[in-house]
Amino acid sequence: MISPIKNIKNVFPINTANTEYIVRNIYPRVEHGYFNESPNIYDKKYISGITRSMAQLKIEEFINEKSRRLNYMKTMYSPCPEDFQPISRDEASIPEGSWLTVISGKRPMGQFSVDSLYHPDLHALCELPEISCKIFPKENSDFLYIIVVFRNDSPQGELRANRFIELYDIKREIMQVLRDESPELKSIKSEIIIAREMGELFSYASEEIDSYIKQMNDRFSQIKARMSVT
């Protein structure tokens, strides 16, 4: 079972070069051993040092970039509306689109991934008013982290974030049950089961959810047909 961590409601601007503190500030339960490890190739874009605990933040790549991104996010930020309208999947198909649709008030919750806990966008997001993130490591990956970003000023925000995490766990459990199937079949079968509710959580238009499920079912049929002739 995933145990994600939500950042505190108001993360204050960080005026420190301590590379351990800035991560614990947004992800308190990160394992202590994480900081005894050498920065990986993705961390090295933002910090430099023998270990993460002894590393220094890079001025241009982290400090200045986080400041630029935070300023941009503030210009795009909008208070939460009373009602949300469906969005297109295309609006959230890349990480920036995923969090931008949340902070601009288009939807209460989104999800994206980062390749480093020192990613400037993640730290900038955590300083915005009424924005929170739940963070957990992606399974079968040594460096990716799932970020669930949501609105605190919407009752739907954290409810949807928690349900997303439940569905994420359900998909993992389904894939474990189907462990004797091919990786492709496991992925498609588990996706079909959760796709509709997941799409609704992400505020996708119903016709796009229908189209995506049809696409998954068509792929499933093609694979089964291919297997039947081999």
From Swiss-Prot:
Task: Please list the GO terms describing molecular function.
Answer: protein-cysteine methyltransferase activity; toxin activity
Q: Which reaction does it catalyse?
A: L-cysteinyl-[protein] + S-adenosyl-L-methionine = S-methyl-L-cysteinyl-[protein] + S-adenosyl-L-homocysteine + H(+)
Q: Which residues bind S-adenosyl-L-methionine?
A: A92, S98, R107, Q111, Y204, E208
Q: Where in the cell is it found?
A: Secreted; Host cytoplasm; Host nucleus
Any one of the GO CC terms = host cell nucleus
Q: What is its EC number?
A: 2.1.1.-
- Which residues does the annotated region (Interaction with host proteins TAB2, TAB3 and ZRANB3) include? 49-52
Give the UniProt keywords, A-Z.
Host cytoplasm, Host nucleus, Methyltransferase, S-adenosyl-L-methionine, Secreted, Toxin, Transferase, Virulence
Q: Which family does it belong to?
A: Belongs to the NleE/OspZ family.
Write down the NCBIfam families for this protein, in alphabetical order: NleE_fam_methyl (NF033830)
Provide the function of this protein: Cysteine methyltransferase effector that inhibits host cell NF-kappa-B activation by preventing nuclear translocation of host protein RELA/p65. Acts by mediating cysteine methylation of host proteins TAB2 and TAB3: methylation of a conserved cysteine residue of the RanBP2-type zinc finger (NZF) of TAB2 and TAB3 disrupts zinc-binding, thereby inactivating the ubiquitin chain-binding activity of TAB2 and TAB3, leading to NF-kappa-B inactivation. Also mediates cysteine methylation of host protein ZRANB3, inactivating its ability to bind ubiquitin chains.
Write down what this protein is called.
Cysteine S-methyltransferase OspZ
| Gene source species | Shigella flexneri
Gene of this entry: ospZ
